[in-house]
């Protein structure tokens, strides 16, 4: 994987930094694992904007990813690595011994031809998945479930991983990249290794148009709006906003705690680093 800085042949190319991976499949994705993906433009069923800065972008298909890794005891081979427009991580097309194909998240170091397996009898090896009760303490894992059988929810983006730091009774304690320590049931599954494509963070799009290709619309500052549109709006000439920064709905936006799910507080051993 190479990081390439483009020559400044135009203003739009001057700041472009590309991450090039020659191992990725250059053809079309596997048709049997594609699904329709409709664009909402950030609107809900009433037609009102519920998510700002969303709209446009290139047409995409959704890749059906196997986040459960529940095909136990059947060896599989990595056929190829692919680009996925729906996530920062790359994905791997897996062929099982019984002929079934599935997409999984591509782990760091994974290559075409590698052998992987799921289940308690799988060896401790990058790409293999098993319940946390069978994973040695100190192991680095990704694609971790929060509820047994629900599918992976933790550490799924490019370069992400968590570390298993303890196991006590029915729960395993994980250290997340944010510094948070969290308890997860030991029957939840995880995959060895960390998610690949960690160089994604080095990428620079270089121009506004590249953001629009990805379906991201411009962000307008509150102080540039009218009073009817934002609490920071209005005033004669340029103003500082006149108050501490808030969202368009008046909620403080700099360090204000918004977590309200007390039901799951008992699973958080230590809050994330500030």
Swiss-Prot record:
It comes from Shewanella sp. (strain ANA-3). Coiled coil: none annotated. Pfam families: Ribosomal_L2, Ribosomal_L2_C. GO terms for molecular function: rRNA binding; structural constituent of ribosome; transferase activity. GO terms for cellular component: large ribosomal subunit. Part of the 50S ribosomal subunit. Forms a bridge to the 30S subunit in the 70S ribosome. The keyword Repeat does not apply. The gene is rplB. One of its GO terms (biological process) is cytoplasmic translation. This is Large ribosomal subunit protein uL2. One of the primary rRNA binding proteins. Required for association of the 30S and 50S subunits to form the 70S ribosome, for tRNA binding and peptide bond formation. It has been suggested to have peptidyltransferase activity; this is somewhat controversial. Makes several contacts with the 16S rRNA in the 70S ribosome.
